[in-house]
From Swiss-Prot:
Its EC number is 3.5.-.-. Involved in pyrimidine catabolism. Catalyzes the deamination of 3-aminoacrylate to malonic semialdehyde, a reaction that can also occur spontaneously. RutC may facilitate the reaction and modulate the metabolic fitness, rather than catalyzing essential functions. Belongs to the RutC family. This is 3-aminoacrylate deaminase RutC. One of its GO terms (cellular component) is cytosol.
Length: 130
């Protein structure tokens, strides 16, 4: 089955050659998502909770554009700049996954801009359309 790009119209144009998400069959792959605004400026500098909320809202919007939602996520890839922010990131994360939790991993690493604190990429499996 061919891949269908997902680029919600309210998102700024990506600053690199990628789509916000891609769907093949009923699987949605959401690109690594950061707290970036128009023109690539970092949002919520120094605030891990606000950056995490922005990232998860962006992922939610991408999934909704594909016909799904947060409950369809089966796996999250989480990248954190510092373990000092791990607790704050998890507090916000838990708000978006109150029931069954998707599988995930979390890696500490450098991100594309020094002010960024968290990046999340997701995989979601949508129910087949009738």
């Amino acid at each position: 089955m061919p891949m269908k790009p997902i680029n919600p119209s309210q998102f700024p144009k990506p600053i690199a050659p990628y789509s916000a998400g891609a769907m093949a069959d009923n699987v949605v792959y959401v690109s690594g998502t950061l707290a970036l605004g128009e023109g690539g400026q970092v949002l919520h500098v120094g605030d891990a909770k606000a950056q995490t909320r922005h990232v998860l809202e962006t992922i939610k919007t991408t999934l909704e554009a594909a016909g799904g939602g947060m409950a369809d996520i089966t796996f999250n890839h989480i990248f954190v700049k510092s373990w000092d922010d791990y607790k704050a990131i998890n507090e916000v994360y838990a708000e978006y996954f109150p029931g069954d939790k998707p599988a995930r991993y979390c890696i500490q690493c450098g991100l594309v801009k020094p002010e960024l604190l968290v990046e999340i990429a997701s995989i979601a499996h949508l129910s087949p359309k009738e």
